């Protein structure tokens, strides 16, 4: 504010005296600068050089003290007042521009004006010059304080205090001057508080107690300042020191209120002191609450509510139920706390933020047990007054808390919130566009809670929360995707609950809003769990038609089908998966893995061997087309895959063979030979051996099928068998030439020989038949039993070959005779067989001689044997057949030939037990025959 010019008679006299004197040059310079400050327009900023220049001239002026006369001082006084008034005008203009730099310059200019007035403070003729000088410093200090220039403010306040300290307070009668003494102390105290000199600040307030002068206004000012410092300490922190300071300062404020009531002379003063006292008590309650002194809080609240100690009525401030509730909670008396909380519903003066905070505080302490109370309070408030969407969001979020789901407490909280947010009034709070942000937030809160319960496998609670979150998604085009997402997760929840029909309803709704692969896949899962396999297989085709389809979903579908034991569905899914490889599309999984998985699935299901064979054939075809490294993979990985396919074919072929499924057995074993052929043969030759085994058993299965079906092999089948055996023969020949025949089982070589004989007999290749048997006879694997079987088979099969049979049986006979302990029954059998073959296929005299030689060989074998060592029946057969062979030569007159047969028959009979009667007759006949021949 501007300070009026002094117009007393004495000053007018001094003014005339001053005008009669010539101004000092320094004063003239100062006046020129003041005129500049007065001439500055409102739109112009104060030059920064002006305060500096004035300060320099003032410094020079101070060097002239003491001043020569009173008129000189009066001139300085007037210049100071002019400068001050100019500062007031400049400050008013600067306030419109809000320039901090300009405000600081004006404050500096004020400081110059105060210093100028201080130089002439002992001027005569001016009332209370000392008080006025002090006032300039006080007001300048206030400006510096507002600019947060606390050091400069403190300097000004201290200078003002020094000036008035020389005045006897008892002699002051003016109320304004008395107020200045108090205000100076309060201002110094505030500045000291700001620069964290708390002790000085409190000391100055305590000094101010001596400057009250019984004035109600003084009591109010000092009490308010104590309260302000107490609030500052309370807000500074929760440490005991800060809280104790706050309590001490507030008690001082309360004490001053009590004393101030005694000085009140008007109803207005009494009302103000009462309001201050109530306010201070509330803050004291807050401090006790912070300190955990809950009993003291309750006492304060009771005092306030009872309206005691001079109060006209009970205090109904909105903070009281909150303070009381928190205190009761601190004392563990939850029922009283609940009463306070419910009582807030009927208090219309309680702001929304306060009761929401109270609900949060109550629930934080009581926890899950307070969920219903929190809901009831909120709905009660909803029916009483307007509640914002933000408040509803806060309550829902607080009740849900940070629970991760899965426990009973979080389930109860979720159920309470579900009831709360599904209330039509709550939903209506979020309906307008103005609360879009809050609507998204509460949807997120509900969604996250549902997700937590879903992860904890509490699908029932999760479904409820997801359903409630759908209430906060608008039914417009922009939110179609969000609604579809909600329906999809609800489908997952009901899948988890095995409520498949409801899950299907939700996913169909989602598909209407946003048809995509996720919806299609979930429908597939539902069909699987409903065991509607045909629908599931149909859904596979639906998935592939989706715009966002990825082959990964087919792999995932197969896994789902396997887990549900729906093997046909898994096969259908993987079969579809294979079609993408044929098209050349880049896939995340190698083709061989898909084939392997398919075959593995099919082998688990007995009766699916035909399908498994088809996929094995496809795999072999793809391997041939792409190359083994490309199809199976490189290195050890590829080798493992090749081994798996080969071994699986072998195992399936063996299983089918045991089950007499010879057609499948043959195909699997043939494929096994192909897969084993892909493997790089190791030094041990094990893989080559497996190729031979597979081929030999494959051809064996073909012949077994022929016998089973009683249908002869076709020409194509015979040629295929021949080709397979040629391949096996080459491998065996290679192994034998390398000296590795020891690793091949003799039985395997025998089977090969037998099969080769059979198949080439069908091709009328008798020369090869003899060659293959001779080759076998010359190998280390040959045993007389094998030769015996070959000989018998060659003599009895449809493709009989007497040359092969004779060779095999002769080789067998030689081996038996050469053994240390010959098996004479077998020898006898072979001799009979050889005689029979020769008898059937004889063509000339040489054959007759060969037969005779066999009989003689049999006789030589029998010579020296113990009785019965050579089979008696076979001996009799030899003797009788030899004797009977003489009949034809006798009739033909071939007496010499007849004699040979009669003689060998008699010789053999002589070695056979039990032929004595026959032998006597034979001897008589032979003697008579010889006589007859001699006489002829």
Swiss-Prot record:
Superkingdom field: Eukaryota
Keyword list (alphabetical) reads: Chromosome, DNA recombination, Meiosis, Nucleus, Repeat, TPR repeat
Q: What happens when the gene is disrupted?
A: Short siliques and low fertility due to defect in meiosis.
- Please name the source species: Arabidopsis thaliana (Mouse-ear cress)
Mind naming one GO cellular-component term on file for this protein?
A: chromosome
**Gene name linked to the record:** ZIP4
Record's protein name = TPR repeat-containing protein ZIP4
Provide an example Pfam family for this protein. SPO22
Q: Which GO terms describe its biological process?
A: female meiotic nuclear division; homologous chromosome pairing at meiosis; male meiotic nuclear division; regulation of synaptonemal complex assembly; resolution of DNA recombination intermediates; resolution of meiotic recombination intermediates
């Amino acid at each position: 504010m501007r300070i009026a010019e002094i117009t007393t008679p004495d000053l007018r006299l001094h003014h005339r005296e001053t005008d009669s004197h010539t101004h000092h040059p320094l004063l003239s310079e100062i006046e020129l600068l003041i005129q500049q400050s007065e001439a500055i327009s409102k739109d112009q900023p104060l030059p920064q050089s002006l305060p500096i220049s004035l300060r320099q001239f003032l410094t020079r002026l101070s060097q002239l003290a003491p001043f020569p006369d009173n008129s000189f001082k009066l001139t300085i006084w007037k210049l100071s007042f002019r400068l001050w008034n100019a500062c007031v005008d400049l400050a008013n203009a600067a306030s419109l521009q809000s320039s901090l730099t300009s405000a600081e310059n004006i404050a500096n200019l004020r400081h110059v004006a105060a210093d100028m007035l201080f130089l002439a403070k002992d001027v005569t003729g001016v009332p209370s010059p000392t008080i006025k000088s002090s006032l300039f410093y006080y007001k300048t200090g206030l400006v510096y304080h507002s600019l947060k220039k606390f050091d400069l403010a403190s300097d000004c306040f201290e200078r003002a205090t020094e000036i008035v300290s020389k005045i006897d307070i008892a002699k002051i009668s003016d109320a304004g001057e008395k107020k200045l003494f108090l205000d100076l102390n309060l201002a110094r105290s505030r500045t000291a508080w700001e620069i964290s000199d708390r002790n000085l600040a409190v000391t100055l307030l305590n000094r101010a107690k001596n400057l009250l002068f019984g004035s109600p206004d003084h009591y109010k000012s000092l009490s308010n300042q104590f309260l302000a410092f107490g609030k500052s300490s309370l807000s500074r922190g929760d440490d005991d020191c800060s809280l104790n300071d706050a309590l001490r300062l507030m008690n001082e404020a309360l004490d001053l209120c009590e004393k101030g009531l005694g000085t009140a002379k008007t109803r207005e003063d009494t009302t103000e002191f009462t309001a201050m006292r109530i306010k201070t008590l509330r803050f004291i309650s807050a401090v006790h609450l912070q300190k955990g002194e809950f009993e003291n809080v309750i006492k304060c609240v009771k005092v306030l509510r009872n309206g005691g100690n001079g109060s006209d009525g009970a205090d109904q401030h909105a903070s009281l139920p909150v303070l009381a509730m928190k205190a009761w909670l601190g004392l563990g008396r939850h029922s009283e706390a609940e009463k306070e909380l419910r009582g807030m519903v009927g208090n219309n003066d309680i702001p929304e933020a306060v009761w929401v905070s109270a609900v949060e505080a109550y629930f934080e302490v009581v926890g899950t047990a307070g969920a219903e109370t929190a809901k009831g309070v909120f709905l009660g408030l909803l029916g009483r007054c307007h509640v914002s969407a933000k408040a509803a969001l806060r309550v829902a979020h607080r009740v849900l808390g940070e629970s991760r789901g899965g426990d009973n407490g979080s389930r109860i909280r979720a159920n309470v919130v579900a009831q709360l947010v599904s209330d039509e009034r709550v939903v209506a709070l979020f309906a307008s566009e103005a609360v879009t942000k809050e609507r998204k937030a509460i949807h997120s809160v509900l969604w996250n809670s549902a997700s937590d319960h879903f992860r904890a496998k509490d699908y029932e609670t999760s479904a409820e929360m997801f359903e409630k979150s759908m209430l906060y998604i608008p039914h417009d085009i922009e939110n179609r995707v969000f609604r579809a997402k909600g329906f999809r997760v609800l489908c997952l929840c009901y899948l988890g609950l095995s409520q498949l029909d409801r899950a299907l309803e939700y996913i169909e709704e989602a598909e209407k809003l946003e048809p995509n692969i996720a919806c299609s896949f979930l429908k597939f899962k539902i069909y699987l769990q409903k065991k509607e396999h045909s629908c599931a297989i149909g859904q596979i085709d639906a998935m592939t038609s989706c715009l966002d389809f990825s082959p990964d979903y087919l792999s995932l579908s197969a896994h789902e089908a396997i887990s549900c034991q729906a093997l046909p569905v898994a096969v259908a899914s993987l079969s579809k998966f294979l079609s993408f490889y044929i098209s050349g599309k880049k896939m995340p999984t190698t083709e061989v893995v898909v084939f392997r998985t398919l075959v593995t699935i099919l082998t688990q299901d007995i009766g699916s061997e035909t399908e498994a064979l088809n996929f094995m054939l496809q795999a072999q075809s793809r391997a041939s087309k792409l190359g083994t490294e490309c199809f199976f993979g490189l290195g050890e990985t590829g080798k493992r895959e090749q081994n798996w396919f080969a071994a699986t074919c072998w195992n399936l072929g063996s299983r089918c063979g045991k089950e007499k499924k010879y057609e499948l057995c043959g195909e699997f074993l043939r494929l096994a030979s192909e897969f084993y052929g892909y493997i790089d043969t190791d030094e041990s030759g094990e893989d080559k051996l497996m190729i031979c085994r597979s081929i030999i058993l494959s051809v064996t299965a073909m012949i077994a099928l022929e016998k089973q079906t009683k249908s002869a092999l076709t020409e194509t089948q015979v040629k295929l068998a021949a080709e397979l055996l040629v391949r096996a023969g080459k491998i065996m020949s290679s192994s034998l030439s390398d000296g590795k025949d020891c690793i091949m089982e003799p039985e395997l070589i025998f089977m090969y020989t037998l099969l080769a004989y059979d198949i080439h007999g069908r091709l009328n290749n008798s020369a090869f038949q003899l060659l293959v048997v001779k080759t076998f006879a010359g190998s280390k694997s040959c045993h007389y039993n094998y030769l015996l079987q070959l000989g018998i088979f060659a003599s009895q099969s449809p493709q009989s070959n007497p040359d092969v049979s004779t060779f095999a049986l002769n080789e067998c006979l030689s081996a038996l005779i050469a053994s240390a302990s010959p098996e004479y029954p077998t020898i006898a059998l072979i001799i009979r067989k050889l005689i029979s073959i020769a008898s059937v296929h004889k063509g000339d005299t040489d054959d007759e001689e060969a037969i005779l030689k066999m009989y003689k060989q049999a006789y030589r074998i029998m010579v020296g044997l113990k009785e019965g060592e050579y089979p008696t029946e076979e001996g009799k057969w030899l003797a009788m057949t030899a004797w009977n062979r003489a009949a034809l030569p006798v009739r033909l007159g071939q007496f010499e030939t007849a004699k040979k047969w009669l003689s060998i028959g008699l010789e053999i009979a002589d070695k056979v037990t039990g032929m004595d009667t026959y032998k006597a007759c034979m001897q008589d006949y032979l003697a008579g025959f010889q006589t007859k021949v001699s006489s002829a």
